[in-house]
Structure formats: C-alpha cells, structure tokens
Amino acid sequence: MMVCLVTDSRRLAAAGASFGARRACLAAQTRFAVDAGVDLIQLRERDLDAADLAVLAADLRAATRTTSTRFVVNDRLDVAIAAGADGVHLRGDSLPIGRARQIVPPGFLIGRSVHSVDETTAAAGADYLVAGTVFSSASKPGQTQWLGVEGLRAIVAAVPIPVLAIGGVAGERVGDVARAGAAGFAAIELFMGAHGGAELAGCRVVELRQTVKNARSRFDRLNTTP
C-alpha cells in the first residue's frame, strides 16, 4: 500500500502567515510524515511562485534524502529537476508525459492526475496515477460530482500501473478504495492540520504515526476481504 501526503502549507500556518512561517510549518509536518513512514510527499503549493516553490523543494529534498520517503513536485518539472526531486506529478494541463520523459534522468518518477477512464489514454507512460475526486472532500468545496468507488474501479481496471485514490479517503473509506483495487491513497486534509493538530511554534502540525498505521492496517485487512 502506498500512502501519499499532498502538501498545502496554508493549512498549517496562521491565516495570512508569511512565507517564512509557512516554510517552517511545512518543515515540521514533513518531519512527522517521514517519521510515520509516508511513502510519497507531493509538493503542491499552487499559490507560490517558482522561487518560493524551489525553496520548499530544497527543504523537502534535504528532509527525505536519506529516508525511504520519496518526494515529487506538482506540475513544475523545472523545479523538480533543479531540486533533485524523485519525480514530478503532472496535471491534465501540464507538459505531456512523452515530452517530460525526454528531459528527465533515468528512474525519475512521473505521476499523472486523472478523473475518468478516458483520461488514462493521455496518461500513457506514467509510473502511477492519482484518481479522483473519489468522495466529497473539503479540499474541493465547489465540486458536486464525484468519481465514486465504481469510477475508481474502472480506472484501476484500465491501466497496468498503480492507481492512488484521492478525495475524502479516510476512515472506513480506506477500505472502499482497497476493495476497488487501488494501490493506496493520497490526501491533503487527513495529513495537513485539519484535525486540530497540536500547536508547535505557531504551527498546526499533526503527529502522523498512528494515522498512517491505522490506514495501512485497515487497507491491508480489507484489501484481502472478499
């Protein structure tokens, strides 16, 4: 099972916090994620410019370099390569996967977001997919239609590579995506200060060891249940 944390440092710091404060909070949460054995961290800070994103990418590289946790950068292939990231996660409007493969080093991970079976064609050549939004999620407040378990199952059946579910995957829903054949799940809200995380130097950070342990246990148990 693969567990992927998708970042949003705005959830960790006080409203209107400076970039420096957000950086410090993300560094603290990253330490908890690595300690918990999170498999993959996706740096996704859509409101930041390339310069600030590069700073966070360098921090993540330093925090994960000697660990089993890998990290990828959302969309910005240039930032990912410059930081020595393990890979990039592409969106539908990102650089095509084939073009990206031409300029990345061997072993570089390329992930792709998909929202339907039809989109898997454009994702050919990816190492893994993130499929969603599966369930209602606070991270997508304006969305009214969801992929659902059957939509996730169809995407899993359509491709030969691992598929991670995203969107409202927590609690018993971990078992739902396991039974649909997903290789794991990705999440923002579950990992990024949304549950009244402890205040640590002004940051709402969450100690993740029990969260990750519970998710793995539930996924592995239900993945083998007929």
What residues fall within each predicted segment?
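Short, loop-centered acidic/histidine patches that primarily coordinate divalent metals
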Residues: 134, 166-169, 188
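Acidic, Mg2+-coordinating phosphoryl-transfer loop and its flanking beta/alpha structural elements
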Residues: 183-189
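Short beta-strand-loop elements within alpha/beta enzyme cores
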Residues: 128, 132
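Conserved N-terminal beta1-alpha1 strand-loop-helix module at the mouth
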Residues: 1-90, 94, 102-127, 154-163, ...
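Flexible, gly/pro- and Lys/Arg-enriched active-site loops
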Residues: 90-98, 133-158
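Residue-level signal for pocket-adjacent positions within structured domains
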Residues: 43, 109, 138, 142, ...
